[in-house]
Structures are given as structure tokens and as C-alpha cells.
A protein has these predicted regions:
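Rossmann-like dinucleotide-binding domain for NAD(H)/NADP(H)
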Residues: 66, 72-149
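Preference for short coil/turn "hinge" residues that link or interrupt alpha-helices
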Residues: 21-22, 27-28, 40, 47-48, ...
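Rossmann-like dinucleotide/phosphate-binding beta-alpha-beta segment
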Residues: 1-65
Length: 149
């Protein structure tokens, strides 16, 4: 994802929840700095005690009002009530989710309150195992972004 973002001219920074990722190609920052500086946050982390509800109300409060939040990792990394609040209160601009905390989406999921597709997009989670699946998906994303730009 980082290399694709760079192709679009993005300055890529990252936070490692484990501290083990030492990728020299991109600037590593702490979580607070990631939240404050990012125009777009894309989550790609395992679910563990350190990441469960990592993105809570306090995290969304620190993000830019113009920020876009994307979670393609695990649903429970995000406090869905906090995300609903952040979208309703315009604390962030928008969110796109490929995963939820509980799938299929329950009737009582707070995200159901967000009816504006400009604020929230939820897509079905697809398996990433086959290389062809990833290539097809990324090619589609690339083409869609090109159309917008």
C-alpha cells in the first residue's frame, strides 16, 4: 500500500504496533504523531491485546478533521462506537472499512446510523491469498482513483 501511495505523490509515514517493523523506506513515527500528521490512515495490523480498539475516541479526536480512515485489517482494531461518533461529529472526514467487529454486520451496529455514503463506505472482505485477487483489486482501485483525479 505504501508504494502505491507514493506513486500518487503521498508522503508515507508509519507506526509499528509491535516495534518490530523497521522499514527504512518510510518515516517511522509514534502513534500520536501518526494521528496528528496523517491525511489518510490505512490500517494493516494483526489483532492482539495491543491493537484491540487502538482506534478509539481519543485517537479519532487527535486526527485531522480532513482525515480519511481506512481499515482493512481486523474489525476489532476500531471502536465502532467511537468511529460512528467521529463521523457524526465531523471529527474526521470519512472512513472506508473492509472489516467489522462482528461479521456479518449486526442490526445494533452503531455504524448503521451513518447513512451518508460520502462519509462511510463498507465493502465486503475478500481473501488475499491468491496473488491474482490482490492484483485485480489493486488494479481496480488504481483505475478508480485515476478517474477521480
Amino acid at each position: 500500500v505504501a508504494s502505491h501511495a507514493q506513486e500518487f505523490g503521498c508522503n508515507v509515514i508509519y507506526y509499528s504496533t509491535s516495534g518490530k517493523n523497521t522499514d527504512q523506506l518510510y518515516e517511522r513515527v509514534d502513534f500520536e504523531e501518526l494521528l496528528k500528521r496523517s491525511d489518510l490512515i490505512s490500517v494493516h495490523a494483526p489483532l492482539n491485546p495491543d491493537t484491540r480498539k487502538l482506534f478509539d475516541r481519543a485517537a479519532f479526536e487527535k486526527m485531522k478533521k480532513s482525515a480519511i480512515f481506512i481499515n482493512v485489517a481486523r474489525g476489532a482494531i476500531v471502536d465502532q462506537e467511537a468511529l460512528t461518533w467521529a463521523l457524526q461529529e465531523n471529527k474526521i472526514a470519512a472512513a472506508a472499512l473492509d472489516v467489522l467487529d462482528g461479521e456479518p454486520m449486526r442490526e445494533d451496529n452503531p455504524l448503521r446510523q451513518i447513512q451518508d455514503s460520502g462519509k462511510l463506505i463498507i465493502t465486503p472482505h475478500i481473501a488475499w491469498a491468491p496473488k491474482e485477487t490482490r492484483e485485480r483489486l489493486l488494479d481496480g482501485v488504481y483505475e478508480n482513483i485515476k478517474k477521480i483525479l
